[in-house]
Amino acid sequence: MSNQDSWEDFCEQSELLPGEFLVREAGGAFVAVYNIDGLLYGVEDVCTHDGGELAGGPIEGFSIECLRHGAKFDLRTGAALCAPAHAPVPIWAVRVTQGKVQVRPR
């Protein structure tokens, strides 16, 4: 079985209400899962500009801003939306199964 097929338990669904996020270690990386209006999005918790954490940065629509230097990323695709970041942030697949939020690398 490849890593792409391996889902990991991340949290209970009840721990991640709309407007909230959680950061946990999964698959050897720190992953942030965001609940935006009931939809879940997962990204590695690292700015590709300088390696800082993304979690806790302001969210507007589907974009998150790094608090360190203002780089923005699309939570749906991982795309860098503005300088100083140019490389996308790795995204993680997220699903809910039997009340558990699960993640895996894409």
Segments predicted by a language model, with ranges:
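Short helix-to-coil "ATP-lid" hinge immediately C-terminal to the conserved N-box Asn in the Bergerat
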Residues: 72
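N-terminal pre-ligand scaffold of iron-sulfur
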Residues: 1-61, 75, 88-106
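Short cysteine/histidine-rich metal-coordination sites, predominantly Zn2+-binding motifs
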Residues: 61-67, 80-89
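Short cysteine clusters
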Residues: 47, 66-69
